[in-house]
Structure formats: structure tokens, C-alpha cells
UniProtKB/Swiss-Prot annotation:
Cell compartments where the protein resides: Cytoplasm; Cytoplasm, Perinuclear region; Cytoplasmic vesicle, Secretory vesicle; Melanosome
Residue segments, region Myosin-binding: 143-560
Keywords carried by this UniProt record: Actin-binding, Cytoplasm, Cytoplasmic vesicle, Metal-binding, Phosphoprotein, Repeat, Zinc, Zinc-finger
Protein's recorded name: Rab effector MyRIP
Spans annotated as Disordered: 252-294, 351-578, 592-625, 778-806, 826-856
Comp. bias (Polar residues): 551-574, 613-625, 784-793, 826-840
Species the sequence originates in: Mus musculus (Mouse)
């Protein structure tokens, strides 16, 4: 696979011997490919059979997956394959000593196929080098044969194919290879090379994206590249061709500056277009007069050229000639344009189709070459052999994709300040600048059909784009506040808004990002409507030129059409382009607004705050504001969910306490309750600590359950988004994560049940939990003596914040002591007081009224 292969020095016998070797190599390759294809087919059938049989669990446990023979003790023992993980018999597998595992026969064949097919070689080397080995030798010999036989006469260029010793399939990273190829080849060969290189680049991008299987964004990128592979290939090939053509034109201009040929002047006032298409022998192709592309292809007419020639009869200075060369450099052409100088016109010969012209010389007649699409049989045979279309079918044609939106939007954008200060040019000035009146007239068919690939500095481009302005004029915004709004974003080819800093949105949910951008744009517009309407009556000095621009758009359309773009400075051009991008962004946002619902409009209108919104906010600050709003919404939702879960757990706990206390009765109000005293033998501090610890455990358990539920929901969403090509190992990892999360949820539920059992044990032991006192916030002595019931503590719990963070949960759970309770602490005292004490305790247990039993 060397860079060069020169076989020009071989004799006929040596060439014949090389051809025999190449033919034998091709035959061997074909046989090997047939054998590998049969092996692949057998493996595919075996895999399909295994996929069907593996669904039956009993068959997998009792029979061999390969030969379907049943397993028997000591006679036909089963063994587990190390690759496919299926159970196979002894006859269907072999032991690999270096790997220390059993491998079935099918997996061995798969390994052999991967080794013999050289997949790594074809994926990494052959995709980059299309022609190497025998194919490269054969191509070189064929080129040599064509050179010797003389059958390689270039139909299009009029020269011979020069032998290209470079590897045409190499993409070493430089475009010099393609430039060298295009010098000695026809444009058809150059286009074929560009298409092949573009296809290889797209395939390499797809393979790189597919290598990152764990990233959802890379998978989406790979699918997009596969779906739009043909369009992207054509676009990239066009870019490569433009670079090749630009370099060829630069070389031609340099040669023209060095030679500076003198062309005879035409003193006649009119030149008739004639269809004298003559042919010349091959020996005349070195004539000094070369063909030039017609003026109609660049929106020039013969009348305009003659007018400009008669107006400027004196020869131009070298500075004007250099300026003309710079203007011509921006025009797409397959041939040099040095001879199309308006001051030095010669008698012309026009082709029958009107697309190509040549200079007429009295002594020598130049050969006529029509560079439109040829119809000869040789050219068509070359097209079929190279499996590509002609370069002239697509290059230089008017299409919807080539339409320059920035130039078309100049009709909708106000002119620059420097343009307003210039007086309106007279028709004579417009003609002297090299642009005739027919070049900008909408009724001129030549101007309407001009090339869409000319530079933005040419006023003929504006005339060519007028036919496409109707759609953009219908979509133009009618709100002046919207027209004045400064937007900091830019647009790519697909009308995707991007930040000014160059950061692209790479989120996995493009619809959500689009809705966020739409809502933000609507808030900006509504916030700026009020201030701008108030400032409209008293315009500031800074806003006066902008309003003046808006008022004079309709009056200055003709002025901008005939003005010369080269007279404006760089700064004015940059400002116009920035305004065009902003206007195009406004159009895209207005089109997307029509698809939103009225409910979202009302919601965004109610939340709009004009005093906080400013037109000079950068895109980064706006993105930060949107992220903060999303965080607040998410925190509010999570706080609501946490509060709901905590209240459910607390209410369930209180319900268990109420049920364990027995049927409710309305006991008489005791004097101790009226005085705010606890029953005899009740340790107030101890009961409060116990209830506080129980509530903390409830909060921790509820927070753990909520966090685990969130993890489960995230795992479920990730499982739904998994691509169909996800491997078995990734699925197994996800299943392990789900099982671990489920185990944690089960553990949290066990903790909750343990807390409930402890509460019931406390109730059965005789502890009166209802008349406890909250000791969390004691600010004065009066609050300490107040008795709080379950009803009042429930109201306080509703005001509690969200449970602590995960670190605090772990610390609290590790520090929480284990409470031990004495069942006989009420039996302290004399034996005579025991019945009385037990009776009083029973009454205290029945004291909570019926209102606290209602669970809500």
C-alpha cells in the first residue's frame, strides 16, 4: 500500500505475467469469500435455532443446545460453554487449556470466522484504502494501456490523461492529493474521487459514533448519519470540489498576472450572436485562445458588456486590473476568466445553446469545446464505468439548497448608516461600475437564472435571488418591537438556534430544549413591548438611526440594488450580516410560536416581569435563568412529594397507635389535665425523647423510600431508552442495579414495620404516648409546661421542612441510640397503691378524644 506504484518500465511479457498473477489472486479471493459466506450462513442458522430453543427452560436444563441429546449421569454429562453460556454435551465442546474453559463447536467456528475473514483489517484498513494490492496494480496497468493506445484523449479538457502515481483511496489528511489528481484528469474523475472520499469520511464518522455504545447521544448521531448519508456525502463532495476549483482559479490568476496578455480591442458597436460551432483537430488544442464561460452564466449580457466597453474606451491601470481579478475570483468557474474584461472586447463566437463563447481570431480559429453536458457515447461509457453522474449535472446549477438566505434577507433588513449617507447614484454611475440596468431588473431572464454560487458582493446575485424573496416577505414579522429586538444567538444550516459563545445544545431531549427557547423568546418580546412603545414618542439619539432605517426600507430598495458593495467598509458588512442573522432567528422563532398552545402563552404572560428583562442580556445568562427556574420547579415538586410521603407514614403510625389503644370512649376530664400535669409515675423527658427518636426514624425511612423510588424511576427510564443493540452484559448490569434498588426498598419497608412494631410494643407496655410534650422549640418557661397531644403535634409536623440530606441521614441513623423500656416502671411503690395506679393509668390511656382518631 505504498504511496507510489510505477509500472511504466515493464515489458510486454512482464506485464502479461503480472496480469496472470493478479487474475489468480482475484480467483483465490472469490473462493475465500464464498467459503466465508457459507460459514456465516451456517452460523446464522445455528444462532436462530438457539434463540428459539433457549426460550424453553426445561429443554435448556435437560438437553444439549447443539445436538439436542439429553444429559445423563456420568455417560453424557453437561458442560457450560465459556462464550455462549449454554449447556452442551461432551461431544459438542472442547477444552481450551490456555483459557481454562470449555468452548462449544459453534463458538469455535465463530472464532475461526473472525480470524479468517480479517474483520479488523477490513474495518480499519480497507475502508481507508479503496485501491491497494492487486486492484492498484490493475488500475495502473490499465492507465498505461490507455496511454499507449491513444484512447485516453480527454473529451472535455482537450488533453491526455497524465498518469497519477498517488494512491487515490488514501485520505492522509491533506487535500493536496486531490488537487494533484484534478490537474491532469477530467472533472468527472475529480468528482468521483471527491464522492469516494466524502463517503469514506461519513462511514468513519458513523463507525466512531457506533463505538460509543454507552452514550445515547452518540447512538442518535450514528442513526442520523445513516439516515442522511447520501445527502451528507453530496454536500461534503461539493465542498471538496469547491476547494479544488478555488485553488485552480488562484493558480490561473497568478499565471495571468505574470503573462498579462494583450487582447485586441473591438471598435464595433454591436456583436451578433452566432451559432458557429466548429470542431478542431487534436493538434490545435495548444492554441493561445482558450474558451471562456459565457456572460449569461454570470448574469451579464452582451449589451451590458458593449455599453461598459464604449463607456470606458481608455485602457485601465494595473490597479483596476487587479481589482477586476479579485472580483472574478469570487465567481465559480471551471476555466480562467482573464479574458472577460469589459474594456478589451474581441469578436465573439457564441455556441448554439448560448452558454459558451470564444474569442474570434482572424489568423487562427480556436477549437470549439462545449462544456455543457456532452452526449457522446465515449463520455456516457465513462460515466457508466465510474458509476457517477456528470460533474455538470450538479455543479453550477440553481437549486433550493444553494439559495443564499443572508443575501435575500437584505431586502428585509434596514441599510447601514454609511449607505444612508451616500446619495442616490445616477444610471450612468451604475453603468460605469460594471453593472448594467439589465443586471438588476426583475424582467431580465438572464439575471433571474444566474448562478447561485456567486459571491455576496455581486449585485447580480441579488437579482437572481428576487424570485425567492416572496416566501421570506410573507414570513416577515409585523411587530416593530420584534424587529428591534437584539438577539445574541446565531443559526446553523438547519435553523437550530445556538449560543453566541459557540456552545451547541447536546441534550437528549430536543423537544424540551425547543420549548424552553420558545418560552424565553416570548418573554423577551412581551417584556420589551411596553418600554419600546413608551420610548417611541421620545426617540433617543442612539435609537434614531434605527428608526430612520426602518422608515426608509421601501424607499431605498432600488438604491441598494444598484449600489456597489465594494465601496462599503468591513465594519458595515459585518453589521449587516449580524442583523440578517438576527432577523432570520426572529422568523424561525415566530414560525415555531404558532405551534404552541394558548395555555402556555397565558402561563408565560402571567410570569413575565418587564422590569427584570433587558434586551442586552447574553445567551449564557438566559440559559442560567432557565436552569434556575427548572431547579426551583423540581425542588418544589420533590418537597411536595416528600411531605406527602412523610404525612402518610406519620398518619399510618398514629392510626396504629390509636388501634392498639382499644375502642374509644369519652372519659371524664381529670383535674391533672386541667392543671397541665402528667399522671403519676410518668417520666416526661423519657417519653419525649422516645417519641422524638421515633419521628426521626420515620423521617429517615420516608426519605430513603423516596430516594429509592426516584432511583427506580430513573432506571426504568434508562431501560426504556436502551437501544435494540444493547449487549447482554449491559442488560445484566441494569438488572443487578434494579435488584439492588428493590432490596433497598424492601429494607426500608422493614425499617418502617420495625418502627410500627416498636410503637405498638410501647403502647402495650402501658406508655401513654398521647399526652407528650414537644421539646424541639422551647423559647420560654410557659411553653415547657404546655401539654401537647397527637392532634397538636400533627399540626406542627405539617410545618416541618423536607427530611435531611443523605449524609445527615447516615449520621443520624448511626448515632440514634437503641431505646430500652421497663415494662414495670408503673409498678413502683407500695402494694396498696398498685390497683389505684393501674386504674389511673387505664384512664390516662383512654383519655385522647375522638377528634385525634380521625386520620386525614
Amino acid at each position: 500500500m505504498g504511496r507510489k506504484l510505477d509500472l511504466s518500465g515493464l515489458t510486454d511479457d512482464e506485464t502479461e505475467h503480472v496480469l496472470q498473477v493478479v487474475q489468480r489472486d482475484f480467483n483465490l479471493r472469490k473462493k475465500e469469500e464464498d467459503r466465508l459466506s457459507e460459514m456465516k450462513q451456517r452460523l446464522a442458522e445455528e444462532n436462530s435455532k438457539c434463540s428459539i430453543l433457549s426460550k424453553h427452560q426445561k429443554f435448556v436444563e435437560r438437553c444439549c443446545m447443539r445436538c439436542c441429546s439429553p444429559f445423563t449421569f456420568l455417560v453424557n454429562a453437561r458442560r457450560r460453554c465459556g462464550e455462549c453460556k449454554f449447556s452442551v454435551c461432551k461431544s459438542c465442546c472442547s477444552y481450551q487449556k490456555h483459557e481454562k474453559l470449555w468452548v462449544c463447536c459453534v463458538c469455535q467456528q465463530a472464532r475461526l470466522l473472525r480470524t479468517q475473514s480479517l474483520e479488523w483489517f477490513y474495518n480499519n484498513v480497507k475502508s481507508r484504502f479503496k485501491r491497494f494490492g492487486s486492484a492498484k496494480v490493475l488500475k495502473n496497468l490499465y492507465r498505461k494501456h490507455r496511454l499507449e493506445s491513444g484512447a485516453c484523449f480527454d473529451i472535455l479538457g482537450g488533453g491526455l490523461f497524465e498518469p497519477n502515481l498517488e494512491n487515490e483511496g488514501s485520505i492522509s489528511g491533506s487535500d493536496s492529493t486531490f488537487y494533484r489528481q484534478s490537474e491532469g484528469h477530467s472533472m468527472m474523475d475529480t468528482l468521483a474521487v471527491a464522492l469516494r472520499v466524502a463517503e469514506e469520511a461519513i462511514e468513519e464518522a458513523i463507525s466512531k459514533a457506533e463505538s460509543h455504545g454507552d452514550s445515547l447521544d452518540k447512538q442518535n448521531e450514528a442513526s442520523y448519519l445513516r439516515d442522511h448519508k447520501q445527502e451528507l456525502t453530496e454536500e461534503l463532495a461539493g465542498t471538496i470540489l469547491q476547494r479544488i476549483i478555488r485553488k485552480q482559479k488562484d493558480k490561473a490568476e497568478l499565471r495571468a498576472e505574470e503573462e498579462e496578455p494583450e487582447w485586441p480591442r473591438s471598435q464595433s458597436g454591436s456583436v451578433k450572436a452566432r451559432g458557429e460551432g466548429t470542431t478542431a483537430p487534436p493538434g490545435r488544442h495548444k492554441a493561445r485562445a482558450t474558451f471562456r464561460r459565457s456572460q449569461s452564466a454570470f448574469s451579464f449580457t452582451m449589451e451590458d458588456a458593449l455599453k461598459s466597453g464604449s463607456a470606458e474606451a481608455a485602457p485601465r491601470s494595473p490597479k483596476d486590473r487587479a481589482q477586476r481579478l479579485l472580483e472574478e475570483a469570487a465567481l465559480p468557474s471551471w476555466r480562467s476568466m482573464d479574458g472577460l474584461d469589459g474594456t478589451n472586447l474581441a469578436p465573439l463566437l457564441q455556441s448554439p445553446d448560448g452558454n459558451w463563447m470564444t474569442l474570434k481570431d482572424g489568423s487562427r480559429q480556436p477549437p470549439t469545446r462545449l462544456l455543457t453536458k456532452p452526449k457522446s457515447g465515449t463520455f456516457q461509457a465513462l460515466e457508466v464505468a465510474s458509476s457517477v453522474t456528470s460533474a455538470y449535472d450538479e455543479i453550477g446549477s440553481d437549486s433550493e439548497e444553494d439559495f443564499d438566505y443572508s443575501e435575500a434577507l437584505s431586502k428585509l433588513c434596514p441599510p447601514s448608516q454609511s449607505r444612508l449617507k451616500q446619495p442616490q447614484p445616477q444610471p450612468t454611475q451604475a453603468q460605469s461600475s460594471g453593472q448594467g440596468p439589465l443586471a438588476t431588473s426583475p424582467s431580465n431572464p438572464e439575471a433571474m437564472c444566474s448562478d447561485s454560487e456567486t459571491s455576496s458582493t455581486s449585485s447580480s446575485r441579488e437579482a437572481g435571488c428576487r424570485a425567492k424573496l416572496s416566501w421570506l416577505q410573507r414570513k416577515a414579522p409585523k411587530n416593530p418591537a420584534v424587529e428591534k429586538m437584539p438577539l445574541q444567538g446565531e443559526l446553523d444550516v438547519n435553523f437550530n438556534p445556538q449560543a453566541a459563545g459557540g456552545e451547541t445544545s447536546d441534550s437528549s431531549d430536543p423537544e424540551e430544549t425547543l420549548r424552553t427557547a420558545e418560552r424565553r423568546a416570548r418573554r423577551w418580546r412581551r417584556a420589551r413591548v411596553g418600554p419600546e412603545e413608551s420610548n417611541r414618542g421620545l426617540p433617543s439619539p442612539g435609537a434614531h438611526p434605527r428608526a430612520l432605517h426602518t422608515a426608509q426600507v421601501s424607499d431605498n430598495v432600488s438604491e441598494t440594488d444598484i449600489s456597489n458593495e465594494t465601496q462599503n467598509s468591513r465594519s458595515s458588512t459585518d453589521s449587516v450580516e449580524e442583523k440578517l442573522r438576527n432577523r432570520l432567528y426572529e422568523l424561525a422563532m415566530k414560525m415555531s410560536e404558532k405551534e404552541t398552545s394558548s395555555g402556555e402563552d397565558q402561563e408565560s404572560e402571567s410570569k413575565a416581569e418587564p422590569k427584570n428583562q433587558k434586551g442586552s442580556l447574553s445567551s449564557e445568562e438566559n440559559n442560567q435563568g432557565v436552569q434556575e427556574e427548572l431547579k426551583k420547579k423540581c425542588s418544589a415538586v420533590s418537597l411536595c412529594n416528600i411531605s406527602t410521603e412523610v404525612l402518610k407514614v406519620i398518619n399510618a403510625t398514629e392510626e396504629l397507635i390509636a388501634e392498639s389503644a382499644g375502642p374509644w370512649e369519652i372519659p371524664p376530664v381529670s383535674t391533672d389535665r386541667e392543671n397541665g400535669m402528667f399522671p403519676l409515675g410518668t417520666d416526661q423527658v423519657r417519653l419525649d425523647k422516645q417519641l422524638t427518636s421515633l419521628e426521626e426514624n420515620v423521617y429517615l425511612a420516608a426519605g430513603t423510600v423516596y430516594g429509592l423510588e426516584g432511583q427506580l424511576s430513573e432506571l426504568e427510564d434508562a431501560a426504556r431508552c436502551i437501544h435494540s443493540s444493547t449487549g447482554e452484559t449491559e442488560l445484566a448490569d441494569l438488572e443487578d442495579q434494579v435488584a439492588a434498588a428493590a432490596a433497598q426498598v424492601h429494607h426500608a419497608e422493614l425499617q418502617i414495620s420495625d418502627i410500627e412494631s416498636r410503637i405498638s410494643a410501647l403502647t402495650i407496655a402501658g406508655l401513654n404516648i398521647a399526652p407528650c410534650v414537644r421539646l424541639t422549640r422551647r423559647r420560654d418557661q410557659k411553653q415547657r409546661s404546655q401539654v401537647q397531644t397527637i392532634d397538636t403535634s400533627r399540626q406542627q409536623r405539617r410545618k416541618l421542612p423536607a427530611p435531611p440530606v443523605k449524609a445527615e441521614k447516615i449520621e443520624a441513623s448511626s448515632v440514634t441510640p437503641i431505646k430500652t423500656f421497663n415494662r414495670n416502671f408503673l409498678l413502683q411503690g407500695s402494694s396498696t397503691n398498685r390497683p389505684t395506679a393501674s386504674t389511673g393509668d387505664t384512664k390516662d390511656l383512654m383519655e385522647p378524644d375522638l377528634e385525634s382518631a380521625v386520620m386525614y
